[in-house]
């Protein structure tokens, strides 16, 4: 980038990066006289692909296609002393994809403490699944949590089913309502007619 420490990646119209090679000793202006190189990706096509932008100062490994010095490309990015690895021996059971702005997908593989966290800093909006922990890795709960400091909305055009009935190992159909229907029938059969202040009876639950 022409701006040292730029917050965002600097790409050309083809999505290539400016790269300064270690053996280039020319005292060129920041961001200029560097090579425009493609970044190799695990998934790529004309209308689809995968991209996690690299920002200024990222160390990369440059290789040459078929050993041709005229066909270099970025093979991968590396952590270094200025950009340390965020998965180390302290949290080696975690799988993490995190952006510079701390948008995050984290998957914990420690047995009996498995969890997934999908989060963004905006409004501290998060989806937490499984063994729920805080930033100190202390247990907060278990199950799932969808939370935000902003507004929330739930919409389901064909219906919304909320139940506290157990469904062991998620083996039954998603909308299995037999147990819930039985409870509603039982409550209706056991309830005496309830009257309002006008002396009229409320109808039983349907």
List each language-model region with its residue ranges.
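Structural signature for extended repeat/solenoid scaffolds and their inter-repeat hinge/linker regions
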Residues: 1-206
């Amino acid at each position: 980038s022409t701006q040292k420490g730029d917050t965002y990646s600097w790409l050309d119209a083809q999505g290539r990066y400016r790269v300064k090679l270690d053996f280039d000793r020319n005292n060129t202006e920041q961001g200029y006289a560097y090579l425009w190189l493609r970044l190799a990706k695990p998934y790529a096509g004309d209308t689809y692909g995968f991209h996690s932008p690299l920002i200024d100062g990222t160390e990369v490994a440059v290789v040459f296609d078929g050993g041709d010095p005229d066909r270099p490309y970025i093979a991968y990015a590396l952590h270094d002393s200025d950009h340390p690895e965020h998965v180390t021996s302290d949290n080696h059971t975690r799988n993490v994809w995190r952006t510079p702005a701390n948008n995050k997908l984290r998957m914990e593989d420690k047995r009996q403490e498995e969890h997934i966290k999908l989060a963004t800093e905006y409004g501290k909006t998060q989806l937490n699944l499984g063994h729920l922990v805080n930033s100190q890795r202390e247990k907060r709960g278990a199950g799932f949590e969808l939370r935000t400091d902003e507004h929330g909305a739930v919409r389901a055009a064909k219906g919304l089913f909320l139940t506290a009935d157990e469904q062991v190992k998620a083996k039954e159909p998603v909308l299995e309502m037999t147990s819930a229907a039985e409870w509603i029938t039982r409550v209706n059969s056991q309830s005496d007619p309830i009257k309002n202040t006008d002396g009229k009876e409320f109808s039983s639950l349907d």
